[in-house]
């Protein structure tokens, strides 16, 4: 039997090529050797068939895996056979035999074989398309109150020109010459258990019985195209960093008529210069003067809802907190909102006028330890420690 060319060599790609690289190589070669571009050229026609056969295997992850492991023998049981035996025999006994792969070999060997003497044509079942995951950054305010966003995504979709068939509109696929249109390859093969007749899915046409010789120019015969779409997303109020929104059916196109995959949007919340979120509560540090802290009074503070006024109690200490109910983050289930926690930071002036210094000295003279509880307790402990 003539030695088949390596599928990677046919498409001119390395063995570690990505699916996108394989698709690009196929489109370029299919255009170059297409029968319409080479009328009457038998060599170009054979080359075009080679290209389609190679792409049929390498574009399918499962077929590609088998090809990488077993080569052409993965799809043609008679490939490399000599006189009904096995190519090369067992020259080294069982020393070189990979028993770890025996399960795969056995599965391939008896694919399509029915122990009662009948066979059935296997077709690839519809499969769900792959899911897509993207990150979406929100401001803190957008995450708290919710919003609507529109994001671009790239995904594989069914070709609108050929309807996913891969055939140029107006053209029809031709009958597969390898299987005669049956979609199956029948062969006799010697095995460890005797001689068997096996029926396998045709690797040239993938079991459909036809070959696309006049591919759709929009998708290059793949039946799918890569497009950018803009998807609208409703962001619920109260969503947190790291949470995921799933849009069903917005992922990659389904395979063999299967449903589309899903789109998963992972939320990232940008840091806010003023507020910090902890669960459903918001925290903010508000600087106040030492006069505000000592005398108390009303001050204006920021919230995500706008400015509001709160009261500072006389004698407020640095780090004291006030909790404002219902000014935090909404609960996703609609059970109200968390709180806004205001932490007071007492700011001491670094520059004072002579008049201010004089007044503070008088204030110090009029002060007693009774007005400074922490200071009084500190010195009481010192005296107790050394008495």
Swiss-Prot record:
Q: Cofactor binding mode, per the note?
A: Binds 2 Zn(2+) ions per monomer.
SUPFAM superfamilies (UniProt xref): Chaperone J-domain, DnaJ/Hsp40 cysteine-rich domain, HSP40/DnaJ peptide-binding domain
A molecular-function term among this protein's GO annotations: heat shock protein binding
Q: In residue numbers, where are the CR-type zinc fingers?
A: 146-228
Cellular component GO terms held in the UniProt record:
cytoplasm
Locations listed in the record: Cytoplasm
Q: Where is the J domain positioned along the sequence?
A: 6-71
Give the cofactors, semicolon-separated: Zn(2+)
UniProt binding sites for Zn(2+) 2: 176, 179, 202, 205
Q: CXXCXGXG motif repeat boundaries?
A: 159-166, 176-183, 202-209, 216-223
User: Cystine bridges: which residues?
Assistant: none
Q: What's in the keyword line of the UniProt record?
A: Chaperone, Cytoplasm, DNA replication, Metal-binding, Repeat, Stress response, Zinc, Zinc-finger
Q: Where does Zn(2+) 1 bind?
A: 159, 162, 216, 219
List, alphabetically, the InterPro entries matched: DnaJ, DnaJ_C, DnaJ_domain, DnaJ_domain_CS, HSP40/DnaJ_pept-bd, HSP_DnaJ_Cys-rich_dom, HSP_DnaJ_Cys-rich_dom_sf, J_dom_sf
Q: What does the sequence similarity comment in the record state about its family?
A: Belongs to the DnaJ family.
The UniProt function text for this chain reads: Participates actively in the response to hyperosmotic and heat shock by preventing the aggregation of stress-denatured proteins and by disaggregating proteins, also in an autonomous, DnaK-independent fashion. Unfolded proteins bind initially to DnaJ; upon interaction with the DnaJ-bound protein, DnaK hydrolyzes its bound ATP, resulting in the formation of a stable complex. GrpE releases ADP from DnaK; ATP binding to DnaK triggers the release of the substrate protein, thus completing the reaction cycle.
The protein's assembly and partners? Homodimer.
Which HAMAP family does its entry note?
DnaJ (MF_01152)
Domain note: The J domain is necessary and sufficient to stimulate DnaK ATPase activity. Zinc center 1 plays an important role in the autonomous, DnaK-independent chaperone activity of DnaJ. Zinc center 2 is essential for interaction with DnaK and for DnaJ activity.
Query: What protein is this chain from?
Result: Chaperone protein DnaJ
* Organism encoding this protein: Caldicellulosiruptor saccharolyticus (strain ATCC 43494 / DSM 8903 / Tp8T 6331)
């Amino acid at each position: 039997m003539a030695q088949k060319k390596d599928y990677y060599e046919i498409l001119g790609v390395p063995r570690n090529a990505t699916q996108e690289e394989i698709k690009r190589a196929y489109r370029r070669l299919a255009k170059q050797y297409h029968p319409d571009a080479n009328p009457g050229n038998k060599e170009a026609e054979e080359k075009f068939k080679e290209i389609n056969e190679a792409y049929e295997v390498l574009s399918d992850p499962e077929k590609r895996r088998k090809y990488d492991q077993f080569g052409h023998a993965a799809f043609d049981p008679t490939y490399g056979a000599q006189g009904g035996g096995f190519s090369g025999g067992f020259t080294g006994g069982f020393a070189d035999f990979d028993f770890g792969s025996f399960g795969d070999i056995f599965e391939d060997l008896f694919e399509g074989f029915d122990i009662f003497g009948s066979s059935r044509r296997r077709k690839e079942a519809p499969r769900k398309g792959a899911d897509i995951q993207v990150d979406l950054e929100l401001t803190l305010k957008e995450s708290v109150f919710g919003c609507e966003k529109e994001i671009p995504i790239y995904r594989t979709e069914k070709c609108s020109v050929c309807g996913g068939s891969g055939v140029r509109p107006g053209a029809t696929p031709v009958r597969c010459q390898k299987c005669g249109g049956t979609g199956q390859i029948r062969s006799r093969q010697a095995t460890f258990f005797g001689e068997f007749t096996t029926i396998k899915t045709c690797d040239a046409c993938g079991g459909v019985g036809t070959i696309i010789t006049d591919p759709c120019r929009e998708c290059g015969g793949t039946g799918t195209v890569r497009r950018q779409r803009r998807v609208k997303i409703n962001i619920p109020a109260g969503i947190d960093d790291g949470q995921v929104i799933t849009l069903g059916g917005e992922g990659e196109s389904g395979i063999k008529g299967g449903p589309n995959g899903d789109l998963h949007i992972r939320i990232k919340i940008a840091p806010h210069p003023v507020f910090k979120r902890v669960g459903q509560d918001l925290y903010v540090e508000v600087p106040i003067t030492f006069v505000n802290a000592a005398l108390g009074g009303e001050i204006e503070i920021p919230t995500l809802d706008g400015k509001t006024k709160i009261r500072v109690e006389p004698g407020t200490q640095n780090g004291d907190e006030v909790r404002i109910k219902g000014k935090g983050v909404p609960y996703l289930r609609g059970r109200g909102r968390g709180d806004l926690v205001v932490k007071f930071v007492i700011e001491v002036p670094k520059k004072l006028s002579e008049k201010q210094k004089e007044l503070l000295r008088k204030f110090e003279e009029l002060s007693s330890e009774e007005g400074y509880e922490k200071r009084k307790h500190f010195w009481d402990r010192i005296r107790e420690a050394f008495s």
